[in-house]
């Protein structure tokens, strides 16, 4: 009797889960209607995995309608994930003109300084882009920064519109380079003090631009609107920049958000993940919920050689490493 009751209870739970994931799948397409729906767009891989599991379960239970529903919506999510499928990380044959960018969100709460130093030393990037650079991090990495002859740091407020009771920290966005550069923009958005930094670099008589970004996290309507305005400002900067372009950093948005899709379309940049893998980067401490919110985007005249995540260094984000050359 107890086993029958337990089985019936489990069936009910799985049906409720099926209903919930189907609803989340549908609402994820309505991100422009409400900021909460936009959050629902980010977990396509998780929806696909959950629905596939439920479909297999309902096959065993011979519940064909629920099986069809689970696999139908699993297919919907799979179609969105598929363009990012792949395990090959070499895109084009490397050559003597290869440039390497390392992008790291340090996480101001993270104190694993030696681990971060090891990532930077091992990667040996031509250009290092850092987000959430605090006073503590600045002091701990000072000798590493001294190895880069060209650098810029920009203070910004990552706590825009956070509640007053939350302790605030002074954070910076930084670009450190072995290649000479000139600053082309250090922008504070008019309604929001979250910056991006743009620099124009020169490598073997070829010029290209790098933008380092840390967009506002979409925690509420106001912050979501701020992030979306920042995406629009970036489009403007890209359109007026007549150079091969790379944008790296923490975008706080996944490829499945309608706002990200609009950004890619308007900027005409290429998503370096496509065809290589989803490569989720955050939150590193909760692996089943990890989503790709750190990005490396390039213009069509950038030849990508490889796109990889770097190793864990204690942050809630994993770093990104791009190797490329200028066409």
Where are these regions (language model features)?
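Short acidic/polar active-site loop segments enriched in Thr and Asp
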Residues: 126
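Short, aromatic-rich membrane-interface segments at the entry and exit
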Residues: 37-38, 64-70
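Membrane-interfacial loop-to-transmembrane alpha-helix junctions, especially the N-terminal start
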Residues: 9-17, 66-69
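Short, Lys/Arg-rich, polar N-terminal cytosolic tail immediately upstream
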Residues: 1-7
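N-terminal signal-anchor transmembrane helix
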Residues: 60, 68-122
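Membrane-embedded alpha-helical segments of integral membrane proteins
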Residues: 12-57
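Juxtamembrane helix-break-helix junctions at the cytosolic face
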Residues: 55-65
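Soluble catalytic domains of enzymes that build or remodel membrane lipids, polysaccharides, and related
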Residues: 101, 107-121, 130-327
